[in-house]
Amino acid sequence: SNKPRPQQVPPRPPHPRL
């Protein structure tokens, strides 16, 4: 049975460290 593939999440830019 073909399982739905999870959508690839684009890598998020690192949040700025304050």
UniProtKB/Swiss-Prot annotation:
GO terms for cellular component: extracellular space. One of its GO terms (biological process) is innate immune response. Its main location: secreted. Keywords: Antibiotic, Antimicrobial, Immunity, Innate immunity, Secreted. It is found in: Secreted. Induction: By bacterial infection. Belongs to the apidaecin family. Antimicrobial peptide active against many Gram-negative enterobacterial and plant-associated bacterial species. Not active against other bacterial species like H.pylori, P.mirabilis, B.pertussis or N.gonorrhoeae. This is Apidaecin +S. It comes from Vespula maculifrons (Eastern yellow jacket).
